[in-house]
Amino acid sequence: QNINWDLRTASVFCATWDADKPLSWRSKYGWTAFCGPVGPTGQDSCGKCLLVTNTGTGAKVTVRIVDQCSNGGLDLDVNVFNQIDTNGQGNAQGHLIVNYDFVDCGD
């Protein structure tokens, strides 16, 4: 959000395909990098949405995949992370344990 939802400025993998989408599309959901063990990879994952649930608190948020990662999970934008870290344990531990499901973005 601090970069006006600019995928090129963020240097994310999906910028090649999604940087020229309307601001309303780019800003509809917080962003995540996706490298989960189940689901599409590479360009096929770009623009897809996930419903992410903090397993410790049940807090949920929908995010849009804009990047890749290599940690075997998700790399949530800090604002998204903070939104579902409702008890502060994720910040204290440096990570959250989450479940995710692919959902319709409603675009």
UniProtKB/Swiss-Prot annotation:
Q: What is its main location?
A: secreted
GO terms for MF: RNA nuclease activity
Q: What's the source species for this entry?
A: Prunus persica
Detail the disulphide connectivity of this chain as listed in its UniProt entry: C14-C46, C35-C69, C49-C105
The name under which this protein is listed is Pathogenesis-related protein PR-4
What is the tissue specificity?
Answer: Preferentially expressed in the tissue surrounding the abscission zone of fruitlets.
Induction comment = Up-regulated in both the abscission zone and surrounding tissues following treatment with propylene and after wounding due to embryoctomy.
Please name the Pfam families in this protein's record: Barwin
